[in-house]
């Protein structure tokens, strides 16, 4: 056991603090122990495994019927009512029939009820994922030879087949119409994304989603919202334009809209204006008086009901050629295994889909868990969301994740547990079995308006950009880069750009952290930045240096430049000149003036001082998170150079991990007691030790 460099004083009594020896366990032993623990078969282990996979088994027996039931039923009914129009509307984004959105909402609510760890999050159709699914579906439809100008909704599309001028890429596809092939692509993509998420959950990779920072997610939501708005503009105007894909989709779509704006359907334009006015006004009033409203007003449902009645009795489709939702069948279709060939082709697209879905789900689950005082498991959330994609993929469903807007509605209407999801699923089931055909005459421009209004929250995030810039310019850059790339290039490229700039921002913050010389605060034992605070007392003939970041290969040169600039002494060059002798041009001029010495690389004509103005350099290692091999070599070279100049290098406030790295890296040498002479528990103790040693040396010289 290692003793600390000096005893700690407590109540006037000296207490010797000893560090416990670290428990060293090799990688093989650790893997064996974890494997043994995982493979242990017993009844308690089996029960814990089942309860871990299905948390509902744990909390359902503890359900407080009188306290929770009313709120869960109310929130479930409201969410179910909201889900129906949103599911039909979001089918436009995914390029699929509305019935598949209803299937997705039904199965996702039931599965997350059993497997989710969040009490409040609503998992189901999400606009951003619908957009990503729709883009892959459109691309694969084009590759398969289908006419890209045809849409999935509407009676005109029921007999849509392969374009006669195109060559199909799929053997036997001639018997599959457009809608059939579209759902094949969507289910294959969903199954692959779900498998990725389940695999991440099994491998305990829930922490990976946290690398998608909040500015990245907000910028991605903003850019994707602009893309969604662009894709719905043609439906609100009633203009038939080709569906653009790939680079610059947003720009090409707006150019096509401007070129064909004269062909707009007046009926769709008037209907869109009325629906947008009603929806936006109702949303603004709901936001303003939300504290007085016990239950949110289901404006979308009212708009859909009224619009469907007007469209049916006004015969808008027949008289004005306004496109409608078309036939929505009732009941469930037989399950089908997703096409393995398509799965391999969309495997890369499924990665971004899985990452975005899991990141939003985990971040929302953790956010609401913190605000309501309970905890969630990121790994179990991955399993839950993954199963919400894997199992429903066999029942003609597409990708799902947590949705912020519906989660907020659940909380506002009194949701207490995930039992509300069962109630929501029951409402969707009622529509699936009985009410779905009633939406036959619903205009698609109404659905587009519902989608656009649902983007209010994401589009409003642009107002947060100035405050984000004042708080952190690096995060603001990540936000702008992600959003701009989503809009100007593609959503997948936007996600990659966000990850790249996030890593670049992280590297920049660690590559050039703040460095400062410290001085003493009065007669206390605390030290602070001498450049930031007035009235501090610098220790005599001692330089205390602080580097607020890790020391590794990317910033080792910046570490040395900062130290040399602040202390006014380039130790490496000075030590070299001293070894070569006085003929190299040594000058008596001191370098303790704080001027920048520039690069650490060697150069001719460097002026080397004889009087440095200090005899000890103390490095405050409290902010030093870790050392790598390059950082260790830097400290060892620095100690060697200082020793050549008769300057002592001391380290203070080293964490146990840094101490271990120093010991294993040979910084402490082989001398007995070297750790007590080089490492100190505080900056003040290091300064006092340096001054005491200096006085001892001066006394010894005087005696001689």
Swiss-Prot record:
The modification Phosphothreonine is found at residue 13. SUPFAM superfamilies: SpoIIaa-like. One of its GO terms (cellular component) is plasma membrane. The chain crosses the membrane at residues 68-90, 94-116, 185-207, 260-282, 295-314, 347-369, 382-404, 417-439, 477-499. It is a multi-pass membrane protein. Residues 532-690 form the STAS domain. GO terms for molecular function: chloride transmembrane transporter activity; oxalate transmembrane transporter activity; sulfate transmembrane transporter activity; sulfate:bicarbonate antiporter activity. Changing residue 190 to M: Decreased sulfate-hydrogencarbonate exchange activity. Loss of localization to plasma membrane. It holds the Pfam family Sulfate_transp. Sodium-independent sulfate anion transporter. Can transport other anions including bicarbonate, thiosulfate and oxalate by mediating sulfate-hydrogencarbonate, sulfate-oxalate and oxalate-hydrogencarbonate anion exchange. Mediates sulfate-thiosulfate anion exchange. Belongs to the SLC26A/SulP transporter (TC 2.A.53) family. NCBIfam families: sulP. This is Sulfate anion transporter 1.
């Amino acid at each position: 056991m290692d003793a600390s460099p000096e005893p700690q004083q407590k109540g006037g009594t000296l207490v010797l603090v000893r560090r416990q020896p670290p428990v060293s366990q090799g990688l093989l032993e650790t893997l064996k122990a974890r494997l043994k623990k995982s493979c242990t078969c017993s009844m308690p282990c089996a029960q814990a495994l089942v309860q871990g996979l299905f948390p509902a088994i744990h909390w359902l027996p503890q359900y407080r019927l009188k306290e929770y039931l009313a709120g869960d039923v109310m929130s479930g009914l409201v969410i179910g009512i909201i889900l129906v129009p949103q599911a039909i509307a979001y089918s436009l984004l995914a390029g699929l029939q509305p019935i598949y959105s209803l299937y997705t909402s039904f199965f996702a609510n039931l599965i997350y009820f059993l497997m989710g760890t969040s009490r409040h999050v609503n998992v189901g159709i999400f606009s951003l994922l619908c957009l990503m699914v729709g883009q892959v579906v459109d691309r694969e439809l084009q590759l398969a030879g289908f006419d890209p100008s045809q849409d999935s909704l509407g009676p005109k599309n029921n007999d849509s087949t392969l374009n006669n001028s195109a060559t199909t890429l799929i053997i036997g596809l001639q018997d599959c119409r457009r809608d059939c092939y579209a759902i094949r692509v969507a289910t294959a993509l969903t199954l692959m994304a779900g498998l990725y998420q389940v695999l991440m959950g099994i491998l305990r990779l829930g922490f990976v989603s946290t690398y998608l920072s909040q500015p990245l997610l907000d910028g991605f939501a903003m850019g994707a919202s602009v893309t969604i708005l662009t894709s719905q503009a043609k439906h609100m105007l009633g203009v038939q334009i080709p569906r653009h894909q790939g680079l610059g989709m947003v720009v090409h779509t707006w150019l096509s809209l401007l070129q064909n704006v004269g062909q707009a359907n007046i009926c769709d334009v008037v209907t869109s204006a009325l629906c947008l006015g009603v929806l936006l006004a109702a949303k603004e009033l709901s936001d303003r008086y939300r504290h007085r409203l016990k239950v949110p007003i289901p404006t979308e449902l009212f708009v859909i009901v009224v619009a469907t009645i007007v469209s049916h009795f006004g015969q808008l489709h027949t008289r004005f050629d306004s496109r409608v939702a078309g036939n929505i069948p009732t009941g469930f279709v037989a399950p089908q295994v997703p096409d393995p060939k398509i799965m391999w082709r969309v495997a890369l697209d499924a990665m971004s889909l899985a990452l975005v879905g899991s990141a939003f789900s985990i971040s929302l689950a953790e956010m609401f868990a913190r605000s309501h005082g309970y905890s969630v498991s990121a790994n179990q959330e991955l399993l839950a969301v993954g199963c919400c994609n894997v199992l429903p993929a066999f029942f003609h469903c597409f990708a799902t994740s947590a949705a912020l807007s519906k989660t907020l509605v659940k909380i506002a209407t009194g949701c207490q547990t995930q039992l509300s999801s069962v109630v929501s699923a029951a409402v969707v089931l009622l529509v699936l079995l009985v009410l779905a055909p009633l939406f036959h005459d619903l205009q698609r421009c109404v659905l587009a308006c519902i989608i656009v209004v649902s983007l209010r929250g994401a589009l409003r995030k642009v107002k947060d950009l100035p405050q984000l810039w004042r708080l952190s310019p690096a995060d603001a850059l990540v936000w702008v880069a992600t959003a701009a790339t989503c809009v100007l290039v593609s959503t997948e490229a936007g996600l990659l750009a966000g990850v790249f700039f996030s890593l670049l921002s992280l590297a920049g913050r660690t590559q050039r952290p703040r460095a400062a010389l410290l001085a003493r605060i009065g007669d206390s034992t605390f030290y602070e930045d001498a450049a930031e605070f007035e009235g501090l007392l610098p220790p005599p003939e001692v330089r205390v240096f602080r580097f607020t970041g890790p020391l590794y290969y990317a910033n080792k040169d910046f570490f040395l430049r900062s130290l040399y600039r602040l202390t006014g002494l380039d130790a490496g060059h000075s030590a070299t000149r001293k070894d070569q002798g006085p003929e190299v041009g040594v000058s008596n001029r001191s370098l303790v003036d704080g001027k920048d010495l520039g690069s650490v690389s060697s150069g001719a004509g460097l002026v080397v001082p004889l009087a440095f103005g200090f005899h000890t350099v103390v490095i405050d290692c409290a902010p030093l998170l870790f050392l790598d091999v390059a950082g260790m070599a830097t400290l060892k070279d620095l100690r060697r150079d200082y020793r050549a100049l008769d300057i002592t290098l001391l380290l203070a406030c080293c964490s146990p991990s840094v101490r271990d790295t120093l010991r294993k890296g040979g910084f402490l040498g082989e001398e007995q007691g070297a750790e007590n002479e080089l490492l100190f528990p505080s900056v003040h103790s290091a300064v006092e030790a340096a001054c005491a040693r200096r006085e001892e040396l001066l006394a010894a010289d005087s005696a001689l």
